[in-house]
From Swiss-Prot:
Its EC number is 3.1.-.-. Disulfide bonds: none annotated. Plays a role in processing non linear or branched viral DNA intermediates in order to promote the production of mature packaged unit-length linear progeny viral DNA molecules. Exhibits endonuclease and exonuclease activities and accepts both double-stranded and single-stranded DNA as substrate. Exonuclease digestion of DNA is in the 5'-> 3' direction and the products are 5'-monophosphate nucleosides. Additionally, forms a recombinase with the major DNA-binding protein, which displays strand exchange activity. InterPro entries: Herpes_alk_exo (IPR001616), PDDEXK-like_dom_sf (IPR011604), Restrct_endonuc-II-like (IPR011335), Viral_alk_exo (IPR034720). It comes from the Viruses. One of its GO terms (cellular component) is host cell cytoplasm. It is found in: Host nucleus; Host cytoplasm. The record marks 229, 292, 317, 319 as: Required for function. One of its GO terms (molecular function) is endonuclease activity. Keywords: Endonuclease, Exonuclease, Host cytoplasm, Host nucleus, Host-virus interaction, Hydrolase, Nuclease. It comes from Equine herpesvirus 1 (strain Ab4p) (EHV-1). This is Alkaline nuclease.
Amino acid sequence: MDSSPVTYSGEPPYKLRRLSPSYPYVSKLRERCASKIETLSEGSARDSLEEEDVSEAMATGAFLATRLYLPSVLPQRITTLTFLDHFKKSRPLPNSDKRLNPIFYRLAYIRDLVGEMELEGIVERGTASRLLGASSPAGFVAGTYTHARDLSKTMSLASVRDAVLAIEAQTRDQSESQLWALLRRGLATASTMKWGALGPQYHPQWCEVSTNAKGIPNNPALQFGQTNERTARSLISALYVARSEAATPDLLVDPGCGQCFVFDESASVPGDAYACGLLMDARTGVVGASLDMLVCDRDPSGVLSPHSTQTTLDFFEIKCRAKYLFDPDLFSPVATAYANLLKHRTAVCLRKFLRSIKNPAVEYFAPTSVPGATEALITCNSSWKPREVNETNRRCGDFDRDHIALNLDASSDVWLFSEPDLESETITPARWDTGELALSVPVFANPRHPNFKQILVQAYVLSGHFPDHQLRPFLVTFIGRHRKRCEEGKTFTICDRPEGSPYNLNEVVHSSCAIPILLFVTPVIVDREGCWEDIEIESLTAFNKTADAIWDSDSPADVSEPTSS
């Protein structure tokens, strides 16, 4: 495992920063494009536009008529069209042929699904064939069944990747998107995989389990996470993600008007520029993952497209801990510990605050032992040892033990936030007693916890799309409190330092969100050399077993020419 520091070639458009100056920016390009669109709509002025102006507008996504669109809200009939039902209509290949890569069965399903949307009139005609890279998109014909064998003969690796990335761009609303929920059914995820002593394993009925899985539970803890995830994303953006001082040529509008970048303004709410949709494994089409936050450029169509100078992709999995939620106006152990933490701002007070509840978010385990699987953050540092420690004889397999060793020396950044400034309506990080804004603590991600497995699968899926980029995953833990009466209904802008001005006016704590108290940012190290191949092989094996079970109970191989539009 290569744990050497990451280096950049050239000046990347993004970088993770800590305590570096904030770079204010201006985004006037879209205003210029909008004015050009108005001019283009007037026939008398069309001929007066210079050719370079038209080219610039097209290059920046001004002509949105050609942009792919798939709806998030679907008719009831469409929501019942699952991958498994579509796959059950497929036929095995003749014995003389090799097995197809499962990705083509997945794309065949997506083509027919989008085709049904065409028939419903909720997407433009030709969208289904255009999504899969057809040079001359044709309208979908009712009754068509697309065969994977057809696609395997016509689609290149590049067109497969383009189709999968286009789907990601159309499902960035995640749980608020019915399309996202439908496409996840029949995909293996970290939660549907089983993890044995040697790594990932599949349930024999993995596809059925995924297809019939219930929706996301509507309990208070998950509601808290869904509400406050965008606050955590805004905090990460304000505290860590900085634009480079050097403007990159393809993002620069006019050297004479300063550094004007095209920022992704297509997200549903401000601060969600780095939100991701459903990414399917480009290697097999069996595994899916939805990242909470990926620092990466997007092209004018909204598709992920890292800049040529960006060699590293940073992504963040966000967890909001509802169990620390408290009312600051009520006397309680948590409120008292928080008041002391805000007053003294020491590592000792931090530990006391974390232990002010029954099951702290950071678990201590002895260096000669192994951690449990309950908490996502762990430590074996003696300074974090509680007065009473329950001795256990836990065991874990080589897979988890190896990852514990890889992450043992990692440390977390901990950010403490001051009380909101009601006059300026801002929230800023508070300096610790050491003078630092980010306190480094010997706390690392727990390989035995489901969050770690989730990040591992996300890294695997992302690496299939961007194999030449080094991945840097982080686990983000957000802790917030209830609002005081004087804070209710207010939206607070996030500053990156006490004496600084807001880095981005879109990075805010919305009125419906909790007031931030603490933010843990924990690097996650995965053994990609030992994991990627295992996941790929297990995925292919699981799919083939599912296919054999379906085909063995059905009719013999269809050796005739497939029927496809």
